[in-house]
Swiss-Prot record:
It is found in: Nucleus. The gene is ceh-9. GO terms for cellular component: nucleus. Residues 128-137 have a biased composition (Basic and acidic residues). Signal peptide: none annotated. One of its GO terms (biological process) is cell differentiation. This is Homeobox protein ceh-9.
């Protein structure tokens, strides 16, 4: 009885499996044909590769270098600049835009350089503080200083 019920439930699926539908076969094994990718201005070679990328591969290393953006050199702060930045950091962990502008002018660097320096310094400071907490030391900001 259970077999009859199971057969009735699965009968529509058996019909799909046994139908005479023949799968379509592709004769081309090119990626563009398999994926039905639209061609860009018909610039596809006989192997299904984009011709413009082939042209780029023929560029000399010098030509490639000239096209790539150059990474800005890392800023090296002088001892005096680092001293002033550290002094400001001890006073304030976060600078206002006016403080940042004033400090940048005083140190002869850009505001962005000051901003990034403070971001990096805060990251270093937070890492040091969390290591102190894990080791059982009292973080600097929780030490009560006599006046």
């Amino acid at each position: 009885m259970e077999t009859d019920l199971l057969f009735q439930l699965l009968q529509p699926y058996f019909a799909l499996l046994t139908s005479d539908v023949k799968p379509q076969r592709r004769t081309s094994h090119l990626i563009k044909d398999i994926l039905d990718l639209p061609t860009v201005n018909g610039e596809i070679d006989e192997f299904g590769r984009c011709k413009s990328s082939l042209d780029q591969a023929k560029e000399s290393p010098i030509e490639k270098c000239q096209k790539t953006k150059r990474k800005k050199a890392r800023t090296t702060f002088s001892g005096k600049q680092v001293f002033e930045l550290e002094k400001q950091f001890e006073a304030k962990k976060y600078l206002s835009s006016s403080d940042r502008s004033e400090l940048a002018k005083r140190l002869d660097v850009t505001e962005t350089q000051v901003k990034i320096w403070f971001q990096n310094r805060r990251t270093k400071w937070k890492k040091i503080e969390s290591e102190k907490e894990r080791s059982g030391e009292i973080p600097d900001d929780q030490i009560v200083k006599p006046q």
